Amino acid sequence: MVVRKRMNRFLLIFLVCLSAVCSLYSQGDYENGDIYLYGETHGVVRILEKEIDIYSGYYQEDHMRHLFIEYPYFISYYLNEWIQSPSDEILDSLYEQWKGSASYNPAVKEFFEEIKKHCPQTVFHGIDVGHFYWSIGEQLREDLEENGMSETEEYSKVIKSIEQGEVYYETGDSLFREQMMVENFIEEFESLEGESVMGIFGSMHVTNKDPEEKNRYGNLATGLIQTYGDRVHTESLTSLAANLLEDPMRVDTITIDGIEYEASFFGRQYLKNILPRFIYRDFYRIENAYDDFSNKKKNSNVLPYNNYPVQVQTKDVFMIEFCLADGSLERQFYRSDGNTWNDMPVTEQFLL
């Protein structure tokens, strides 16, 4: 089990890393190699398919081999082991450990499988802070120690990624996360000695590319442009998600008031930059449930149809699961009675 470090250690790590990032931002000219960043809405099939198409083009036509991803170093280490393996055992293990995250989505797993199938010489570079440091990160640390690799560069990167994850999950500091992503990206990119790369990240990390117009936290693209200038190219793919989903990403079974229901999952929306109290919300449509909940007392909360990633019909019932800033989960239930608010069709929250 990982023992949580004292806050003074977190502060020390933060200051050291921040100093390193500031130094990297101000470095001089670099030669060769462009950076192509694509912003996504996580887990959307149309976007994942487009990303495969774009990367395959770079891979086949431009001989690009390096794909930067929104995962920590230790996950990309395992992905690189997996892509060279004849089996999918490593990916299967990672996928099971991604439960509870946006990566636990069959479309995401299929994305990696397609990369392995069509672009088998790909090298993944994970540059995010240490998400899953308590499980996957510690697992790799132990694996390397058992194999006598505790003095290697790989081991140092694993420890660094774990420590970044500890700081981020202790403080919730999004500025720290963005700055670490910039530092980690630059470190990996510079090690390639002039090769061009593609990166896939959530749109909030990519779309704000003007250093003079920083968003609330700054972001990855801003930091990279400060270092590499017009060698950084950004494009948002989020418009591909504008069309509402027709089919669920998966179907779960949940129990409400002692009764089991099928719950169709329609995706996750990240809220931290919009509503600081929340990290994200997950949308579930509870199938064939309206009659069971139509008489439940409503409160005054409404949620317009345009908040949902799927077409809403009268007599639909939804469960929205919020992840709060402290990591706790809160479930809210809404139903569509065909009512409007300010001339907008809305769902209304009801109480269990």
Q: What feature does the model see in each segment?
A:
Residues M1-M7:
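N-terminal secretory signal peptides that target proteins for export/translocation
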Residues L12-V21:
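Bacterial N-terminal signal peptides
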Residues L24-L352:
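Compositional signal for N-terminal targeting/processing segments
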